[in-house]
Amino acid sequence: VTEQEWLNCTNPKPMLEYLRDKTSDRKLRLFAVFCEREYLRFRPDMSEGIGSQYAATTERYVDGEATFEEWEGVRQFVHGAFHHTDPYYHARYGVDSAVCCCYTDDSVREVQIAAEHAVLAAVVRDIFGNPFRPVAADPAWLTSNITALVTGIYADRAFDRMPILADALQDAGCDNADILTHCRSEAQHVRGCWVVDLLLGKE
């Protein structure tokens, strides 16, 4: 995968393959959680059940708020014979789970799959950023206002506040185009967003 391919890719699988061994387990698990939520979006009959519990427990686990045993118990119940513990495989399996709900009408199946792949590829970029241009946070940006703002965005999933974060970062002296553009983008932001994680010191 080249940088240009990364920026334009509409299939998350080669992107995940490129990231393998280059990123954290936490990031991969958060992507898998998004895929699980996409699956539940297509399956409202399961949205209040074990699938939703698995997504919520995984998010708590990656933030140290749930034990491995608690997470593993829910994971095994959900995935049954799917026994891989490697987060990379969970991310790949998540893609297949999200896409499988597109198999509703053979006449439009390929279009539906392509559309869902494009959604997932955009979320890969939101969570992992551009691996060809890593960005470091300047401590000068981490004012009390920005820290409070970004903490609230993460805790509340209040991604509608991202443009406000961009303005605050600019006021603090941030002129990084990648960060500011991402914050102001209308693309979907999710738990694990690379800018939010960067400012919170999460990997």
Predicted segments, located by residue:
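Structured binding/interaction patches within domain cores
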Residues: V1-E203
